[in-house]
Amino acid sequence: GGRVQRFREDFTRLPSMATLGKLWDDHPEAALNAANQVGYVLAAELRSRGVDYSFTPVLDLDYGPSRVIGDRAFHRQPEAVVALAGALAAGLRQAGMGSCGKHFPGHGYVVPDSHVALPVDDRSLEAMQEDLIPYRQLSLDAVMAAHVIYDCMDCNTAVFSNKWISYLRNDIKFNG
């Protein structure tokens, strides 16, 4: 949804995930309902046109300075991200589509756009624990790793890191 909605012509305009996060701040139940509806509409419209999967939801925490993530993130608080992403994923499932949490282990803290640069997150694993909460608490069908280097774990980007993939499988217990 929002600025990164790829299918636009003859599709419902969906709000950015940050719009749902702002609604969460004042009206959590309404935000959960809206997130569920967004997931359902997104999946139903794509499936009606032969697209069977969308790489959503974004699980990055909104730390503020990352413009590439920006309004693609639901919220700064992991509890809000878990609730809203869970509701969106439920809507996807209701319309017959799986969910893919991204960008593991978290892209929201770094400023550079990983589509054009190679961001490095220099936080410790301990400092990243909030970013990992959505991956620990949600039941996801798939996870997309980030094209970001996390010095605390590896010199490779998470997408090419056996250490991060092992952490996802063994510590977080992801089995999708």
Regions picked out by a protein language model, each given a short descriptive name:
Residues 1-81, 109-121, 146-156:
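Enzymes and membrane/adaptor proteins characterized by extended Gly/Ser/Thr/Asp/Glu-rich
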Residues 80-176:
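Second-shell residues forming the walls of enzyme active-site clefts
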